[in-house]
Design a protein with these regions (language model features):
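Acidic, low-complexity intrinsically disordered segments
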Residues: 45-87
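Intrinsic-disorder/low-complexity peptide segments enriched for small residues
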Residues: 1, 37, 80-81
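Short, charged/polar N-terminal "headpieces" of proteins
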Residues: 1-23, 28
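Amphipathic alpha-helical interaction segments
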Residues: 13, 20, 40-41, 65, ...
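Generic structural "secondary-structure junction" signal
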Residues: 7, 41, 84-85
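A short, structured beta-strand/loop element
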Residues: 18-44
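A generic short-segment signal for beta-strand/edge and adjacent turn/coil regions
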Residues: 1-4, 8, 32-33, 48-53, ...
Length: 87
C-alpha cells in the first residue's frame, strides 16, 4: 500500500525545532519531522515562530508530502527527518 497522508494534523515540536506530521502505510504510522531550516528553504519569507512555521508547512503541504514520500521510499525506519537538501 502506498504512503498516504489522510490526517492533516501537524504540530510544532519546540524540543527538536521541527514540525511533526504523520504518514500512513496501511495501518503503520510513519512519523515525519521537517526542521526549521528546511521550511525556511522552501518558504524564505516565513516568520521564525510557531505560527510562521506552521503557516509555511500549510502553504507547502503538497510539496512536503511529495518529498516525505520520496524519503520514506529510501527505506523504513522509526521516524523520518526532511532536510533542506531533500527539497
Amino acid at each position: 500500500m502506498p504512503l498516504g497522508f489522510p490526517n492533516e494534523c501537524r504540530f510544532y515540536d519546540e524540543a527538536v525545532h521541527a514540525v511533526r506530521f504523520s504518514g500512513y502505510d496501511g495501518a503503520l504510522e510513519a512519523p515525519f519531522f521537517i526542521g526549521e531550516r528546511a521550511l525556511k528553504q522552501i518558504q524564505p519569507d516565513m516568520s521564525f515562530n510557531e505560527s510562521g512555521l506552521l503557516k509555511a508547512f500549510d502553504l507547502n503541504r503538497e510539496r512536503i508530502y511529495a518529498t516525505a514520500t520520496k524519503v520514506y521510499e529510501r527505506g523504513r525506519k522509526g521516524s523520518y527527518d526532511l532536510l533542506p537538501e531533500d527539497f
